[in-house]
UniProtKB/Swiss-Prot annotation:
Organism the protein comes from: Lactiplantibacillus plantarum (strain ATCC BAA-793 / NCIMB 8826 / WCFS1) (Lactobacillus plantarum)
Protein name: Segregation and condensation protein B
Protein family: Belongs to the ScpB family.
Name of the gene encoding the protein in the UniProt record: scpB
Main location: cytoplasm
Lineage, opening ranks: Bacteria, Bacillati, Bacillota, Bacilli, Lactobacillales
Oligomeric form and interacting partners: Homodimer. Homodimerization may be required to stabilize the binding of ScpA to the Smc head domains. Component of a cohesin-like complex composed of ScpA, ScpB and the Smc homodimer, in which ScpA and ScpB bind to the head domain of Smc. The presence of the three proteins is required for the association of the complex with DNA.
């Protein structure tokens, strides 16, 4: 694995929050000048490759992967599925985690699920079921996510207080995140369905 590959991997997992040079230095042990040089090289590589949809954006010493403007129409069609289309298993899983644990960051969601959740979160944001509620006051200023009014309407809830009570202890086992998350999601879906049938 090359040094640039390591930086590219960090950019990917950092998602929309991005990553600072200091954070890359901490994760890799590379010197800051070398990191800046490799970020420039990677950005140039993306820009020069007509078959790559990626680019690197930098703001206030924070770097993040983004997609080139040319692919925007395709991404728009992918993300803006009509609300009449049922949510995927991954979307329901992320939505349930946000609903019960909000506000929380993408990294916290990733830790609970055991997989990268960036694209799923963005799809939920574009469908207006999830929104940015603030940012943590720590390096990188990670985005905090919460549910929207449309989320309540979508699931037929009057407020977050109407969410069915479930055992959140299943989410506390960091060593086995996926099975516990599955149980959590199943409880979320089953109890919502049961409450609808009782109405």
């Amino acid at each position: 694995m090359t040094n640039i590959e390591q930086i590219e991997g960090l950019l990917f997992v950092a998602g929309d929050e991005g990553i600072t040079v200091a954070e890359i230095e901490h994760a890799t042990g590379f010197a800051k000048p070398a990191i800046t040089t490799m970020l420039t090289q990677l950005a140039t590589k993306y820009q020069a490759d007509p078959d790559s949809a990626l680019m690197i954006l930098s703001t206030a010493n924070t770097y993040r992967l983004a997609t080139k403007a040319a692919v925007a129409p395709v991404l728009k069609r992918y993300f803006e599925a009509p609300l009449t289309t049922s949510l995927s298993q991954a979307s329901l899983e992320v939505l349930a985690i946000i609903a019960y644990r909000q506000p929380l960051t993408r990294i916290e969601i990733d830790e609970i699920r055991g997989v990268h959740s960036g694209s799923t979160i963005q799809k939920l944001v574009l469908r207006q079921l999830v929104t940015e509620t603030g940012r943590l006051s720590e390096p990188g200023r990670p985005i905090l996510y919460g549910t929207t009014e449309l989320f309540l309407d979508y699931f037929g809830l009057k407020s977050l207080d109407d969410l069915p009570a479930i055992d959140l202890a299943a989410l506390s086992d960091a060593e086995h995140p996926a099975p516990e998350t599955d149980l959590f999601l199943n409880a979320f879906q089953d109890k919502l369905q049961a409450e609808r049938e009782d109405e």
